[in-house]
Amino acid sequence: MIDYKSLGLSEEDLKVIYKWMDLGRKIDERLWLLNRAGKIPFVVSGQGQEATQIGMAYALEEGDITAPYYRDLAFVTYMGISAYDTFLSAFGKKDDVNSGGKQMPSHFSSRAKNILSQSSPVATQIPHAVGAALALKMDGKKKIATATVGEGSSNQGDFHEGLNFAGVHKLPFVCVIINNKYAISVPDSLQYAAEKLSDRALGYGIHGEQVDGNDPLAMYKAMKEARERAISDQGSTLIEAVTSRMTAHSSDDDDQYRTKEEREALKKADCNEKFKKELLSAGIIDDAWLAEIEAEHKDIINKATKAAEDAPYPSVEEAYAFVYEEGSLN
């Protein structure tokens, strides 16, 4: 484990980081159970990526703008999208904070939390976040904009256009490629020939680095340093977080393109289990503390699930709400 004290973190910080990683995982696991029970139609999972997500989130400051991608459940949970909010979205209920029950699950959005609305076409959030970074720079605010994408998105035109613009204008922008080595069923060997995707930063004139995405402290360090550069007028950063996708692409995907041995190896590399063992070994947490957290998160999720399931669906009359501006043509 990285020397957390050198990062300005305390033992309490590490416990908080683990708690959010665990809550994100538990919400994710409940979504899968609801899907398999036939209660919700679709799940796209972030299991195995919680270390990257919470490490990144923990380094951000209030007022920063984020453009997450669909696997960033733990990230948006930390940013303020509650378990109840997530289940409302999964059930397609009226009070879904993302879209009022209109958008697909895991298409996060919250003006109050500075979370830009997620689109289904991948990489489109990069130009959106770069535009937000431009606005922050023009307004003279010491804040940053971030976008996260999977490694498959790094081959999209929006990726190049956004990072090129960010580099030219030295914007306070950080792009995180969460490299879980699969774009649905396409392995990384068929996605790119470079040794590191972070090396692409050189062509944009920005800082680039590859980090261990299974280590929340490594991710925290990289994002904290990137943020400091950004607010100090040193331009943008491209971070490649190498991590794992422990599930199929989604609940509609057959994961047979990965061997049984490969899937088993992913479980052994579980970032949550790895970090938990490190904290136990260091004496920062113990079994009693873990049992308390387990009970707390189980209670949160059970209550949120029931409340969301019992919540009303949108009415037919609300079909066009938030689609067209209300009012007369005169």
What do these predicted ranges mean?
Residues 1, 105-107, 206, 210, ...:
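Generic preference for hydrophobic/aromatic residues in regular secondary structure cores
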Residues 1-52, 59-60, 246-247, 251-256, ...:
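Conserved acidic/glycine
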Residues 4, 25, 95-102, 239, ...:
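N-proximal short alpha-helices
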Residues 26-29, 33-169, 187-193, 198, ...:
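Cofactor-binding active-site loop characterized by glycine-rich and histidine/acidic residues
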Residues 70, 241-243, 323:
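A general secondary-structure junction signal
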Residues 114-310:
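Glycine-rich ThDP/TPP pyrophosphate-binding loop and its adjacent helix/strand module
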